[in-house]
Amino acid sequence: MISDAIRAVILGIIEGVTEFLPVSSTGHLLLAERFFDLGSGNFWDTFTVLIQPGAILAIVVIYFAKLWRVALGMFSNPADRRFVIGVLAAFLPAVIVGLIAGKYIKELLFNPWVVCFSLIVGGAVLMWVDQLDHRPREHDATAFPLPMYVWIGIAQCVAMIPGVSRSGATIVSAMLLGADKRAAAEFSFFLAIPTMTGAFAYDFYKNHADMTTDDLGTVAIGFVVSFVTAIIVVKAFLSYVTRNGFTFFAWWRVIVGTLGLIALALGR
């Protein structure tokens, strides 16, 4: 029997590694819980959301100088103000869809079959986009045209289907709209801050009354582990995709999804 602390460490590592890669952290966490007995039930379903602030904090730490500059300049600098408006415009579609359909998406689609098919289809799309002859026009994630931010936000809504990947949907849409690989990845990171913070706040509000002191300790372990892991992964990811693209992650998705389908077909 795996202790809660060990479960928290393992799930924290999975969250930190997969949250900002285009491979679906939610999908990997659901499959880990299903196939490796890494927690099931209401608390562990909520746990995967409650540890996300660790990954968010990693982005804030890595990009602190840029985010602080924007925060100081958004009332006086038109470029900084336009970026803040762009992030909010990209965030808004997820809020609307989440409030209207979030409950039904969770009830109907949060199962391992959907995750596996989504991983495979998303991997094929990622591979296709990576092989296109890109002629990027946008090289600065803080200076995209406003309509581009909106379209990326709409694409992010597709990632409410588990296995699609929030970062995958936003990176792919940004590249199709003219961003280079690094700028697409960086805007995906910036958009994660309000999106994941909102998801955390909503889940915590709904479930905090049912949590015990021990539960809070378990969440704290997962938080710290996801934070440390995410800092390492994000820095390595940016360096890797700038040179090599996303094909490795596309194959990762296809292989994990295929193995998952085989396991499900065998009755796991």
From Swiss-Prot:
Keyword set, alphabetical order: Antibiotic resistance, Cell inner membrane, Cell membrane, Cell shape, Cell wall biogenesis/degradation, Hydrolase, Membrane, Peptidoglycan synthesis, Transmembrane, Transmembrane helix
Segment forming the signal sequence: none
Keyword Transmembrane carried by entry: yes
InterPro entries, alphabetized: UppP (IPR003824)
Pfam assignment, any one: BacA
Topology with respect to the bilayer: Multi-pass membrane protein
Catalytic reaction annotation: di-trans,octa-cis-undecaprenyl diphosphate + H2O = di-trans,octa-cis-undecaprenyl phosphate + phosphate + H(+)
Compartment list: Cell inner membrane
Membrane-spanning ranges: 47-67, 83-103, 109-129, 144-164, 184-204, 218-238, 246-266
Highest rank taxon of the organism: Bacteria
GO CC annotations, alphabetized: plasma membrane
Gene Ontology MF term list: undecaprenyl-diphosphatase activity
EC number: 3.6.1.27
GO process annotations (BP): cell wall organization; peptidoglycan biosynthetic process; regulation of cell shape; response to antibiotic
Function: Catalyzes the dephosphorylation of undecaprenyl diphosphate (UPP). Confers resistance to bacitracin.
Additional observations: Bacitracin is thought to be involved in the inhibition of peptidoglycan synthesis by sequestering undecaprenyl diphosphate, thereby reducing the pool of lipid carrier available.
PANTHER family: UNDECAPRENYL-DIPHOSPHATASE
Family in the record: Belongs to the UppP family.
Name recorded for this polypeptide: Undecaprenyl-diphosphatase
Organism: Nitrobacter winogradskyi (strain ATCC 25391 / DSM 10237 / CIP 104748 / NCIMB 11846 / Nb-255)
